[in-house]
From Swiss-Prot:
GO terms for cellular component: fungal-type vacuole membrane; Golgi membrane; membrane raft; proton-transporting V-type ATPase complex; vacuolar proton-transporting V-type ATPase complex; vacuolar proton-transporting V-type ATPase, V1 domain. GO terms for molecular function: proton-transporting ATPase activity, rotational mechanism. This is V-type proton ATPase subunit E. Residues 15-45 form a coiled coil. Changing T9A: Increases ATPase activity 1.4-fold. Pfam families: vATP-synt_E (PF01991). Keywords: Acetylation, Coiled coil, Hydrogen ion transport, Ion transport, Membrane, Transport, Vacuole. Its main location: membrane. One of its GO terms (biological process) is vacuolar acidification. Gene3D superfamilies: 6.10.250.1620, ATP synthase, E subunit, C-terminal (3.30.2320.30). Subunit of the V1 complex of vacuolar(H+)-ATPase (V-ATPase), a multisubunit enzyme composed of a peripheral complex (V1) that hydrolyzes ATP and a membrane integral complex (V0) that translocates protons. V-ATPase is responsible for acidifying and maintaining the pH of intracellular compartments.
Length: 233
């Protein structure tokens, strides 16, 4: 008989993942400040060098040379500004990608904490079953999680029955086709008996979905609206 555990709702599972989003926001703010400061410094240095070089080149034909120098300076400044803008945009994307990658690596810490991971895993399985709504489900997991899932079967069936009501679940089969531990740190992939319908509820997939949903808002909050964008959703 398995011991009863406190199952998390899908919202509570999202709360756990949203903690990662808070971490992402904090890290991205710091990265954005560093990137902008560095870009401003590089811009001012390069602009100063250009002004100095152009001024030194002015000879007796002062007015003509000055006019040409100012035009050249304006063109060069515009080129530099565009180059710096592209550099900042590239650095921002790289920093956000790096932060999401760091957060992804921290997922293994959640899966290694059995007390924290167990209710999350049960909720991920139940959530996938509720999306599937099939009488028989095949659960693919990491090999190390098989015994844990076996111990939760009764709790999973009971919670599913309470929530699904008119779509009874007759059997849960734990597949011996295990998830790749090098690609997945936790969670499950659940499919129907024919394996034609599949629900990916791994921790990585949930973080990916969360990141895709959060990224536009994070960009807007950290960097402000795009000056070239005329319309917003």
């Amino acid at each position: 008989m398995s011991s009863a555990i406190t199952a998390l709702t899908p919202n509570q599972v999202n709360d756990e993942l949203n903690k990662m989003q808070a971490f992402i926001r904090k890290e991205a703010e710091e990265k954005a400040k560093e990137i902008q400061l560095k870009a401003d410094q590089e811009y001012e240095i390069e602009k100063t060098n250009i002004v100095r070089n152009e001024t030194n080149n002015i000879d007796g034909n002062f007015k003509s040379k000055l006019k040409k120098a100012m035009l050249s300076q304006q063109i060069t400044k515009s080129t530099i500004a565009n180059k710096m803008r592209l550099k900042v945009l590239s650095a921002r994307e790289q920093s956000l990608d790096g932060i999401f990658e760091e957060t992804k690596e921290k997922l293994s810490g959640i899966a290694n904490n059995r007390d924290e991971y167990k209710p999350i895993l049960q909720s991920l399985i139940v959530e996938a079953l509720l999306k599937l709504l099939e009488p028989k489900a095949i659960v693919k997991a990491l090999e190390r999680d098989v015994d844990l899932i076996e111990s939760m079967k009764d709790d999973i069936m009971r919670e599913y029955g309470e929530k699904a009501q008119r779509a009874p679940l007759e059997e849960i089969v734990i597949s011996n086709d295990y998830l790749n531990k090098d690609l997945v740190s936790g969670g499950v992939v659940v499919s129907n008996a024919s394996d034609k319908i599949e629900i990916n509820n791994t921790l990585e997939e949930r973080l990916k979905l969360l990141s895709e949903e959060a990224l536009p808002a994070i960009r807007l909050e950290l960097y402000g609206p795009s000056k070239t964008r005329k319309f917003f959703d």
